[in-house]
Regions:
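Polytopic transmembrane helical bundles with strong interfacial aromatic enrichment
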Residues: 1-332
Length: 332
């Protein structure tokens, strides 16, 4: 299990770096740095580094190759240790690592399709969402291997109410991240609003671009307000809720607050477009923290249901039927 844990952490770090670099590719307009050539760049695996957009795009592809190797290694090690508790079988690290490998291969193929389509906004957003899926599956493997609070979630107790609230946070987070990717790629959307917190429309861009940024902002605010409510609920019910879930909620809320600060500074200080990569990096942190919150809350709720059922069965009473809401969506 220790080897799986180490490789999952390494894969998670590489995935985060790859996603941040992908944001730099989009923001710098380097997505077509190799033209419509894929997987090679103008017929070369190692082309002459004569242009900056080519360097950025090729570096992004190299990072993708490293990520594939890291995830494949994680799968192989998990398969070798599949007999250990928590690795093989339902809810084990092996299944989630296989999901991560499938997602990363799909992301690689979709990246090639995106290049062939000339980096169309819809294809870029689809690629971005698949990349978020890769991150989620690697995070699932990391948690199942005992890191990021995975071990504590099996021994602490919590409610399905907290799990449902965490699911909503994760859903809002992925929607906000998707709209963030569209805002960065759609012509004029990134500069559609010139003021904060309200949107002072930029007269030089089309209304659709402004609407995209307004929707992105609205989702971000809804996520922040929801996480405030989640933290308040968990603090009020701290005697019956898992500390690891409260800690994860605090981290997610802190990431959202940081993101709102970064976004406001970008607009008010008229920061250069390259600094939008920091905004995207924080967005990745938001998705990772919200997904971890949802998965940990689900894991805690399921462990609590199992413990209650075992206690009732030991006393000879009827075993309560588990509710569907407490079943983790990522366990397979």
């Amino acid at each position: 299990m220790r080897a799986v844990r180490r490789l999952s952490i390494a894969a998670l770090v590489v995935a985060c770096l790859h996603l941040v670099f992908g944001a730099i590719v989009r923001i710098s307009g380097s997505g077509m740095g190799c033209g419509d050539n894929w997987p090679k760049c103008y017929g070369y695996w190692f082309p002459p580094f004569s242009r900056m957009d080519l360097v950025v795009e090729v570096s992004h592809r190299y990072l993708a190759s490293i990520l594939v190797i890291a995830v494949a290694s994680m799968v192989l090690v998990a398969f070798r240790h599949r007999a250990e508790p928590g690795v093989g079988g339902r809810g084990g690290a092996l299944r989630s690592s296989l999901g991560a490998l499938g997602a990363v291969l799909l992301a690689a193929v979709l990246g090639g399709v995106t290049v062939k389509l000339g980096n169309a906004p819809w294809a870029t957003v689809a690629h971005w969402l698949v990349a978020m899926t890769v991150l989620a599956m690697i995070a699932t493997t990391t948690i199942r291997s005992g890191t990021l609070g995975g071990t504590a979630a099996l021994v602490q107790r919590g409610s399905s109410r907290a799990a449902r609230a965490a699911y909503v946070a994760a859903a809002l987070a992925i929607l906000a991240v998707a709209l963030g990717g569209l805002t960065a790629k759609f012509p004029g959307a990134a500069v559609g609003c010139t003021t904060v917190p309200l949107c002072g429309p930029n007269p030089s861009v089309v209304p659709s671009s402004i609407h995209i940024q307004i929707t992105h902002r609205t989702l971000a605010v809804l996520l922040a307000l929801h996480l405030v409510g989640v933290v308040m609920m968990l603090r009020k019910r701290r005697s019956t809720e898992a500390p690891i879930v409260l800690r994860a909620a605090w981290i997610a809320l802190a990431m959202v607050i940081l993101q709102l600060g970064v976004a406001s500074a970008m607009i008010l200080l008229h920061m250069r477009p390259v600094y939008r990569s920091l905004h995207e990096a924080t967005g990745i942190g938001i998705w990772l923290s919200c997904f971890a919150l949802a998965y940990l809350a689900s894991r805690v709720a399921r462990a609590s249901e199992t413990a209650v059922a075992a206690t009732v069965a030991a006393r000879g009473g009827p075993v309560p039927v588990q509710r569907a809401a407490t079943t983790p969506v990522t366990d397979s």
